[in-house]
């Protein structure tokens, strides 16, 4: 299909639906020595923005080197600073320290106030696709999906939504430096009352003279892509609608029509 995924488990997060990610992970789980005799109840996917929300509720985290992470700087640390200030082999240890501290503090202060604050934040994070869950227990999954925690393609004609999905193709940590923005302008006419012009922009904010100052782990190990992001971009039309008249400026390819899981979409590659 258009995803062209490898056998790397990290590719599983590329699916647009959490259910597809969960089923793919379950398939791998059953093939692993540590998974074949252990039942997998479900999956939870989070990114550093979710961890930052946890720190905001549970309290600051102090790292061994004296760095203090809080509800404002945690995401930047985990997505960028940890790579600029530490060697690649040290980064996983820092992630473990932060995760352990968050969970420990959360369990220690699990009261109604904490639960209320988390619930409000988690709904927003799920809507923005920083957080997703799926349960293999049907009755529980119904509740999770109803609460908006199992991501799916939008199928609401009343509130049409254009889907734009990106996945990095240059093994690097360049995502932090890519500014993504969207402009939407309604250009409806009598014959087409629900017509919009959408402009989606990817801007690399890393200056050329800064590339050499960063490690290959951040900028990428391939000379032809060093300091550049290479994004595979998928565009999904609003449910019941269509996309047309693509125009590209810069080094992106013109989106080509494709399909995935019986849904029409358009794929492009942008550097």
Task: Tell where the protein language model's regions lie, with residue ranges.
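Non-catalytic, solvent-exposed segments at the cell envelope interface
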Residues: 1-271
């Amino acid at each position: 299909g258009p995803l062209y995924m490898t056998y790397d488990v990290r590719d599983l997060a590329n699916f647009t639906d959490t259910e597809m990610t969960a089923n793919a992970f379950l398939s791998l789980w059953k093939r692993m020595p540590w998974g074949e005799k252990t039942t997998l109840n479900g999956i939870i996917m989070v990114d550093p923005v979710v961890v930052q929300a946890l720190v905001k509720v549970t309290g600051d985290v102090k790292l061994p080197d004296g760095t203090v992470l809080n509800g404002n700087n945690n995401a930047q640390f985990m997505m960028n600073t940890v790579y600029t200030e530490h060697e690649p082999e040290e980064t996983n240890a820092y992630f473990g320290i932060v995760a352990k501290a968050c969970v420990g503090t959360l369990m220690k202060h699990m009261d109604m106030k904490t639960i209320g604050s988390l619930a409000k934040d988690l709904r927003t994070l799920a809507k923005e696709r920083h957080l997703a869950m799926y349960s293999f227990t049907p009755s529980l999954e119904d509740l999770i999906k109803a609460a908006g925690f199992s991501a799916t393609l939008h199928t609401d004609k009343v509130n049409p939504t254009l889907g734009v999905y990106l996945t990095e193709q240059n093994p690097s940590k360049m995502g932090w430096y890519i500014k993504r923005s969207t402009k939407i302008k309604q250009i409806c006419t009598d014959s087409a009352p629900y017509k919009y012009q959408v402009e989606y922009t990817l801007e690399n904010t890393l200056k050329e003279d800064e590339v050499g100052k960063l490690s290959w782990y951040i900028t990428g190990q391939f000379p032809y892509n060093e300091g550049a992001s290479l994004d595979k971009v998928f565009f999904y039309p609003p449910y019941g609608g269509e996309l047309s008249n693509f125009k590209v400026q810069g080094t992106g390819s013109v989106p080509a029509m494709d399909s995935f899981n019986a849904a029409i979409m358009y794929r492009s590659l942008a550097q």
